[in-house]
Amino acid sequence: MEKVWESGRRMSRSIGRGMGMEAWGVDEAFMPQNSGGGGGSRGRRRSGRGGTADDDEEALRWAAIERLPTYSRMRTAILSSAEEEAAAAAAGAGKQQYKEVDVRRLGVGERQEFIERVFRVAEEDNQRFLQKLRNRIDRVGIELPTVEVRFEELMVQARCHVGSRALPTLLNTARNIAEAALGLVGVRPGRQATLTILRGVSGAVRPSRMTLLLGPPSSGKTTLLLALAGKLDPSLRRGGEVTYNGFELEEFVAQKTAAYISQTDVHVGEMTVKETLDFSARCQGVGTKYDLLTELARREKEAGIRPEPEVDLFMKATSMEGVESSLQTDYTLRILGLDICADTIVGDQMQRGISGGQKKRVTTGEMIVGPTKVLFMDEISTGLDSSTTFQIVKCLQQIVHLGEATILMSLLQPAPETFELFDDIILLSEGQIVYQGPREYVLEFFESCGFRCPERKGTADFLQEVTSKKDQEQYWADKHRPYRYISVSEFAQRFKRFHVGLQLENHLSVPFDKTRSHQAALVFSKQSVSTTELLKASFAKEWLLIKRNSFVYIFKTIQLIIVALVASTVFLRTQMHTRNLDDGFVYIGALLFSLIVNMFNGFAELSLTITRLPVFFKHRDLLFYPAWIFTLPNVILRIPFSIIESIVWVIVTYYTIGFAPEADRFFKQLLLVFLIQQMAGGLFRATAGLCRSMIIAQTGGALALLIFFVLGGFLLPKAFIPKWWIWGYWVSPLMYGYNALAVNEFYSPRWMNKFVLDNNGVPKRLGIALMEGANIFTDKNWFWIGAAGLLGFTMFFNVLFTLSLVYLNPLGKPQAVISEETAKEAEGNGDARHTVRNGSTKSNGGNHKEMREMRLSARLSNSSSNGVSRLMSIGSNEAGPRRGMVLPFTPLSMSFDDVNYYVDMPAEMKQQGVVDDRLQLLRDVTGSFRPAVLTALMGVSGAGKTTLMDVLAGRKTGGYIEGDMRISGYPKNQETFARISGYCEQNDIHSPQVTVRESLIYSAFLRLPEKIGDQEITDDIKIQFVDEVMELVELDNLKDALVGLPGITGLSTEQRKRLTIAVELVANPSIIFMDEPTSGLDARAAAIVMRTVRNTVDTGRTVVCTIHQPSIDIFEAFDELLLLKRGGQVIYSGQLGRNSQKMIEYFEAIPGVPKIKDKYNPATWMLEVSSVAAEVRLNMDFAEYYKTSDLYKQNKVLVNQLSQPEPGTSDLHFPTKYSQSTIGQFRACLWKQWLTYWRSPDYNLVRFSFTLFTALLLGTIFWKIGTKMGNANSLRMVIGAMYTAVMFIGINNCATVQPIVSIERTVFYRERAAGMYSAMPYAIAQVVMEIPYVFVQTAYYTLIVYAMMSFQWTAAKFFWFFFVSYFSFLYFTYYGMMTVAISPNHEVAAIFAAAFYSLFNLFSGFFIPRPRIPKWWIWYYWLCPLAWTVYGLIVTQYGDLEQIISVPGQSNQTISYYVTHHFGYHRKFMPVVAPVLVLFAVFFAFMYAICIKKLNFQHR
């Protein structure tokens, strides 16, 4: 073996062992072998590549393995080690080194070494290795299980809203709630239409054949895939049948037999790629691989066949269940090209991880790492370049052909070479199958219908366009007949008469013989892995996530320590006495505060659980594990942290405050605090499971706390709770915790050995008197009753959480919408099929008609790229010269010379031994972009395309930039550059609640100046310009459609791309950067977007686009190409030429570069011939070659020319930084905020509903309490009610505003970077927008509470109650906004905000009256906003009442005297309280504005 390696064959694609011939070499070993020769002398003969000594060594090892018991034999394999071979070679030994290994304990190094040797070039070595696996199986005559999926007369229908009724306004949402409530009792008001998604389709997906699913948008591809995988939403109506090997879906477990790979990537962001795949592999198990291996080994032993070591090791290693990290994972990582990022976290919105294309591959790998052989794959190539897509599909094709798997895959823009990998094609359009059968006959079918695919047109692109009414005519090829539109239904009928259709019909007419189905083909058990293994995997994953989220737990503990220290010093034992009832009530306040802090401590579980739910729901639907397997580790692994936090709290507070000194009472309180924490964690987990959405869960959690808090027995004693609410007292967990804590404390000797006189003058033990006065149970057994109650609630909440995970589905599914016009047309012609785009609907009716056709520039006829004319023909029936646009602009060029970009070296790379301080991402990039020239910026993933664009556009927020950048010869100044440039980001970031036209008007009004040259730019001219831009980008018929959230409501992906372009165009820029404008689009949508781009260029603007996997049409629509290689180096910069000829000539001139094949996509060919593997093969560096070329010298000359200003020109200059004045910016921002708030029911309706519920709850619980002022306890109850209402409504306002501000802040970063406005007008507009909504909220809250509690109806008192409540709600809302502004996201903001809730509570004056707060903490009382609120509410209502009340242990007093001396509230202080409340609101709003201006958490 070592001779092979030493002879220069290191580039050989794998290492294999031959089976049969004497003295095989490496190349011969990879040759395909006949699969029929089972056993015989041929199988027994062995030869070594290193001679007989090697063969003898291997034979001895194998003989030793054969003597082992069956179980051990299945776990033991022979491994040849490269390191040991090298050592032997150095020592002069002439034989190969082997060792026996336990495949369950293969080390990381051993696995990696094996993969490196066997799969050096993934797609090529994969085929060879799989061929050897297959040969081994065939040699002993084992038949692999196969699955044929058939569907007959499959029909799927949905019910959906019509027209504007679907828009998410406050009014529509209220109607939806009302209709849902009526629907529960059988009444179904409202207009809904039936949408037929699939119309009686029939077909078959066969094993060993790769099947491609094609179709235009909304044709039903995803629905078909879901239906075949048995994963259709239960709310959909389904007809027809789907069978696997003749078995219907109900007869076996479809989720285990087949896997649906979604087009959305849902993963745990904190886990690495390898950990994600390992967990998936452990949950899916190995299926029947072990049984197959056992039978294989038995037959080989009988036949005397000795398998190849590598093949044997691989099969054994991938057949072992319960391995933490499997060789199957390493294999999957390699064939998907994920091995380079295996140890990188996947990432999410909170943390940077792998790229979007890599995430897409992880989604695929998560399923193929398991034993499932039936795969339904939905658009798995989004975000991938064409060469990566080709590699992945090629590997999957090999698995299908050699492993007899069944795969149906939909792709958006498959390149011709990828298309050629498929055996069968299913073409779906308008819910009907137009063609299904061999790929070779698909063009023949359409030619029989009169349509022909053009020469330089990809077949897949042709197939997706030929059924479209807009695009069909250009493909008409029958010159003997005039063109007429052929409908989808007619195509479908013609296919049934086509020879392929007839064969399919014959195939389906013969039922599948169930007896032919392999017993291992289908899975009949929901659980394929043992419970023990699932628990091990789940515990390991949960522990890993806890370690990765350790910051949260450390932060929580530190926060708890701080609050404990504050509480200890507030209730310091030197200030705490046990003399009378007043002293006792202070202790009750300390116990109550302890209870509430530890209850609130569980709030973090809410957001942590919500973020995990999407991944859980995905795993649940795939039957990875039952729900309790997810919840058990979740609960158990939190217990140690809860114990630590409980110990910390009790140790810090117990003796410092001065609770009962007995040791047993210390440990009893510790137990109770622990149980309270466990109960709180269970409560918030259950809330998260029931609500399933962050905003709703925040409100639901606050609602649960409110009910438990109010009915816990401490705000309102049991005797005072109305009988209609008494049930709430018994189901409040806080009641059990409160009573248990109090009994534990007040039964101590220091309370029981002292006596006080009751109202009748009879002596009573102080502890008993205290408990009776506070309505606490006086039975000492209540400690254990309370502890048992808390334990019971803990178990109940966790069971409820588990049940919610079992039975509830995730929220926020896309809602199909039918426009008014489409519905009327369907009613008129009786067509049940409606064309649907999720949520793309006009607010005043239908807008689903295709976009109006565009005038084309006369410049097109002279274009050098013939791809342009074909591109423009898509969807266009008219053409003519474009008139000039209403606003002039100055064409500008951009040149850049030797641009370098560095970032600080990542810590992970430094840990791996990298010594440099900086990582270089761009290296000596030189080039230019010119007016009326469309430039493509290309390169493989990670080449630095977006990085270069960000650097040139000035969008980088970090790193180090070097080089010379000039605009028309003058040095680039970012402030002025932002005014004349536009940047279309890949992610299409827009405010979701405004319409298309409103988005454009908003951008135009902020970015267009008052004057261009001598021309005044009036508002009417701006509106006219907006209309022209909408026409240019074909959005005029979508002008009244809501933008919406991607994938949920609003515009389709392609429409959002065009909106992104339009938003930049209305700024009238001279230079436009576009990042991936066609990513995630099908061929037709990409063509529409590119036509928009081309139209933009033809107005004379400078446009640059990064692009991933262009079709031939799209690629040749560009004029020039700037190509980067990995490392950010230029390898080509120049013209494409007609049919890309100039670019092709450049690369073909390089020695060793293969010629382009006929009809091959030039973009794909270019990426392939310039890849890293090609550089290794040619032993050259393309970047160095380019730098020595004539092309480079020409570009240098051009850059030097463009770096000199033309005579008579001047540098860009604007008198102000922004186009609009500060007032103008504020007006525009306020206008958009108004629209956003009105159309945000999930925010405003939720908080309004919560406020209404709180008001009614408090009103019914504290019914007419204002008239029952007989004693001090009644007054304390009223104060408690007021404090509770303001605190909970305030906290809910704070929590619900955070996600809204966070979403809008993302848009703000884009708009501010574009130079639309400064931060202050934006922030002030958002602050002002809250005022009317909070006013409405306060108005109905005040009326309800004031009336039901029967406070005194005087104008002054009512006004003061309203005033204090209004500004309290307002400052809480602004406090929430401020916490977002100082945090990277709303999850961190929620934790930060919660940290101060406890302090607000403690110093509110409710738990400990102001006169009793130690002097060293009194300063914080005056800084606590909640304290001023309670002060204002109490003193305005009761500060002037002279009614006599009884006070326990003291003489009777007036209410005003008691309020002044017990609580420290002075009536004369009211003129100070009012402005202070206003100041708190102003302060938080001001801090929000300052932080949003100064802090930037966007890392680019």
Swiss-Prot record:
Spans traversing the lipid bilayer: 551-571, 584-604, 639-659, 670-690, 695-715, 724-744, 783-803, 1245-1265, 1277-1297, 1331-1351, 1358-1378, 1388-1408, 1416-1436, 1472-1492
Keywords of the record: ATP-binding, Membrane, Nucleotide-binding, Repeat, Transmembrane, Transmembrane helix, Transport
Keyword Glycoprotein: no
GO MF entries: ABC-type transporter activity; ATP binding; ATP hydrolysis activity
ABC transporter domain mapped to chain residues: 182-455, 894-1151
Annotated binding of ATP 1, by residue: G215, P216, P217, S218, S219, G220, K221, T222
Lineage, uppermost ranks: Eukaryota, Viridiplantae, Streptophyta, Embryophyta, Tracheophyta
InterPro entries assigned to the protein according to its UniProt record, in alphabetical order: AAA+_ATPase (IPR003593), ABC2_TM (IPR013525), ABC_trans_N (IPR029481), ABC_transporter-like_ATP-bd (IPR003439), ABCG_dom (IPR043926), ABCG_PDR_2 (IPR034003), P-loop_NTPase (IPR027417), PDR_assoc (IPR013581)
Composition bias, Polar residues: 837-846
Bilayer disposition of the protein: Multi-pass membrane protein
Region Disordered, annotated ranges: 26-56, 822-850
GO cellular component: membrane
Listed Basic and acidic residues bias regions: 822-834
Binding-site positions, ATP 2: G939, V940, S941, G942, A943, G944, K945, T946
Function: May be a general defense protein.
Disulfide cross-links: none
Superkingdom as given in the UniProt entry: Eukaryota
Protein's recorded name: ABC transporter G family member 42
Domain ABC transmembrane type-2: 533-746, 1224-1438
PANTHER family, per the entry: ABC TRANSPORTER G FAMILY MEMBER 39-LIKE, PLEIOTROPIC DRUG RESISTANCE PROTEIN 1-LIKE ISOFORM X1
Recorded family membership: Belongs to the ABC transporter superfamily. ABCG family. PDR (TC 3.A.1.205) subfamily.
Organism of this sequence: Oryza sativa subsp. japonica (Rice)
A Pfam match: ABC2_membrane
